[in-house]
Amino acid sequence: MSDDGRMLRLSRALGVPRSTLWALRTEVEACWVRLRGYLNPAAWLELRRLRTRRDLLLNVATGPYVLDGFVNLELRAYHPDVIRWDCRRNLPVADGSCRGIRIEHFLEHLDPRDEVPQLLRDCYRALAPGGVLRIVVPDVARFMAAYVARDKAAFDALAVVDPFPQDLPTWIDIVNHSFHQWHEHRWGYDVENLTCFLNGAGFSDVTVSDYGTSRVAPLGCDRDEHAPYSLYVEAVKRMHTP
């Protein structure tokens, strides 16, 4: 049985929404990973060594999609090459130690009032002057534009299946899914609000990028399946912080 199938069975047995059970599971795993970093000697040494490294490329909340040449951070042990870390608020690296950081389809899963500002400020701390932060998120503005226009071709371009899924049968259901994804997503982003978040974290040079291209070439290792409906934004840390 799949994880979602088990959660559905547990939800029905307990009378608790699946979204609540998934959130509880994440918090339990995060607590375990934090304790592991203190109590497991191998994990403690791994994190200590990481804090001594410089000129890093960081792949934040990678899931099972690890990248060669990157330090891959992930809460769950999807792959032997990940360093386990709760990436929602901070990064386990030294100040100014990274020349590039990429965050693909993770920011929308974070609380926009608490976690997003903290993580972006910590990315700024971790980047060397001139370092680049690349963020990839669902482009909710495109979903909204397609909805307002009732433009089936625009939804097709966003890789929405035809006919619509059985559990998302209408135009507005598709838009809701882009924002919430069954409560896995916490916030929606367009260029304007993502720029505001980045400016608030200290970044001043914020630009829209494209799939597969970056000011730091390795950061452009974007996942193909996200390309049709993603927004790509890059921000640069100032060369000299006042």
Functional labels for PLM-detected ranges:
Residues 55-143, 192, 233-239:
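Conserved SAM-binding loop
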